[in-house]
């Protein structure tokens, strides 16, 4: 009964037909779409599964985040930048190195100088405004005073205002004239009054030698040097270096303001006997060791040459041959033996020639006895060679 009642109760419920019907066939997904299973997780619940999650390494946190989808806390990167140089840095050390560098210091100095210039300009503008207000104050005060008078004095008030305006215009015109005159006088008087030495001290530059210095002491040391003095002597023509005008260069080209008086000239150094054609060559010669040694009195160094005339005069290389005027004796009586000399003398006596050579019997070349004829004959043998007569001579 219980089972029947149970089934009967269930059959009477309206939800039963829905359970009894067979399920609909599932839809076949397409080949391109892959089925994904949703895996919703509560982040707080899953973090509780890993009690040491906050103490884990960053790599382990990244793996868990990739697997379970934990959102890692995103830290905002601190941006370090320099607004003056328009640069961004990755770390504090880079920023500190930039702030200590020369590039940042130069830009900061330029910015400060611009600010100072702007301040000076604003100060000048404020001074001009105060000056104009001072000049206009008498007019306003006079007008205020005249406004307080009665209506019968209108003509006198207008006359006073005209007079005051004329006075102010005269004052302003006189001031402008005095300023322009002072400026013109200053411009006209400054070039002739400023000498070359004063200009060099002001600019820290020697226009004669074309040398720039950093202080007045360096300029004095340069002026007391030998190079500057020799250049002055060359310009004045009072020293050992003489200046001569270059041929064909008169009246050519405009005259420069920084003319040193040494352009378009040739120079001759009397100490070294050297001619140069320009100012730069003169400077090079003055700074050379040769000129310095000659100016200090040192003897010139001998140049290497295989054909030096001085060495030839002191140490002759050749051998002088002296020829006597007397005729030399003939060599034949000395070379030939005594019998030949005797035969020649006998022939001369036989001819009875007045120009016969009478020679004293000379000693033989070899003091030994004459060779026996047996040695001069060829040795016996099957081969016989004809021997020429042997003549002994010292050469």
Curated annotation (Swiss-Prot):
Record flagged with keyword Nucleus: yes
SUPFAM superfamilies listed in its UniProt record: beta-beta-alpha zinc fingers
InterPro entries noted in UniProt: Matrin/U1-like-C_Znf_C2H2, Znf385, Znf_C2H2_sf, Znf_C2H2_type
Chain intervals for the UniProt region annotation (Disordered): 282-308
Subcellular location(s) per record: Nucleus
UniProt keyword Metal-binding present: yes
Keywords noted in UniProt: Metal-binding, Nucleus, Repeat, Zinc, Zinc-finger
Molecular-function annotations in GO: sequence-specific double-stranded DNA binding; zinc ion binding
ZnF start-end (Matrin-type): 80-110, 204-234, 267-297
GO CC entries: nucleus
Main location: nucleus
Pfam families: zf-met
Name of this protein: Zinc finger protein 385D
Taxonomic placement: Eukaryota, Metazoa, Chordata, Craniata, Vertebrata
